[in-house]
């Protein structure tokens, strides 16, 4: 009900959004996500390995293990949506240097994987000063740009405003802060892009 309501609100405002869905939710609510896709919204794959019976965060696993976890999720997604996903987001932004090549190997094309400056090793989520803007990731180092055929669109952050004892940057999740703080995060991001000359 919440996903359908969010889709209706966004459609009424003339917006198209991306819903990333864990396989267990897709199995139960596939019809809702097919409706949302028919309205022009994007539906992609979201992985929390624990929801698939695994013990660790996604970024703890090696290349072959990540491919296996992804393929399990892709199979469920394809059964419900009638197609394979192209978009992907890992739970907790958990990833390692195997992740982008693994995403490429299973045919995923784009998504929100990185959270620049986030430092939560307990979630296998360490992003350092990774790129703030959309980019092709490096094949051997997740924090650099490179030639992996996957477009990473990092979460919008304010690297100067820190949460959780400094481990996490302010981002645009609605549950974190109020609209005024989100305005500042957006404003700073736009000004940064304009100053750098890379806003298009």
Give residue spans per PLM region.
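Metal-dependent polysaccharide deacetylase catalytic core of the NodB/CE4 family, i.e.
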Residues: 13-96, 148, 157-159
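N-terminal regions that are enriched for targeting/export leaders
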Residues: 1-8
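Active-site-adjacent pocket scaffolds in enzyme catalytic domains
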Residues: 90-200
């Amino acid at each position: 009900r919440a996903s359908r309501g969010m889709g209706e609100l966004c459609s009424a405002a003339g917006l198209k959004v991306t819903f990333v869905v864990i396989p267990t939710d897709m199995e139960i609510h596939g019809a809702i996500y097919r409706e949302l896709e028919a309205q022009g919204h994007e539906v992609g794959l979201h992985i929390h390995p624990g929801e698939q019976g695994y013990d660790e965060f996604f970024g703890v696993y090696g290349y072959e293990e990540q491919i296996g976890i992804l393929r399990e999720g892709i199979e469920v997604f394809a059964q419900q949506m009638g197609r394979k996903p192209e978009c992907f987001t890992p739970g907790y932004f958990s990833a390692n240097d195997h992740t982008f090549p693994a995403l490429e190997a299973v045919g995923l094309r784009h998504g929100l994987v990185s959270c620049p400056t986030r430092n939560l090793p307990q979630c296998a989520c360490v992003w350092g000063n990774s790129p703030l803007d959309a980019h092709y990731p490096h094949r051997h180092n997740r924090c650099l740009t490179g030639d992996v055929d996957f477009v990473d669109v990092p979460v919008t952050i304010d690297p100067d405003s820190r949460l959780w004892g400094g481990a996490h940057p302010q981002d645009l999740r609605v549950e974190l802060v109020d609209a005024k703080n989100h305005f500042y995060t957006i404003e700073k991001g736009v000004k940064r892009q304009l100053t750098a000359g890379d806003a298009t």
